[in-house]
Amino acid sequence: MRRLLWLLLPSGVLALDLGSKAWVLSFLREGETHRVIDGFFNLSVGFNRGAIFGSLIWLPEGIRFGLFTLAGLAALVYFGRIFLARDTRPFDRVGLGMILGGALGNGLDRWFHGHVVDFLDFVFGTWHYWTFNVADSFILVGAVLYGIGLLRHPSASGAVAAPKP
């Protein structure tokens, strides 16, 4: 029962991601921008047909689709197995839940639409950050949390601890 309760985290992340994408697409189309905080934050819809930051866009669509599908399924099985394991620490489970929910959101986008919807657009002075989405945010925060967990308890993750001097 406790493991089922933990499924609420990735499910919630998935709902936030898909809901936010549906919301922004209800009033903006690809290439359109709505300024929220002038000179700092925009809603700017872009369709990422490549991998992270638009990489691998040069590959033919069929190869990209197969590659992303296999990589996504492998990651879901790997992280899902750790997430549901009885001995996974709660801190690690939070990070993994964020990663899983975000990966599912972007994966479903790619599976059903052939691209990932990105729309969060930040500008810092002359620096314009990549456009991203809610799923990307949760994946990043989840990876940081999971990484902290691995550093704090390397043997629990299956990683080999450094020898003591």
Model-based region annotation:
Residues 1-165:
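Alpha-helical transmembrane bundles and membrane-interface segments of multipass inner-membrane proteins
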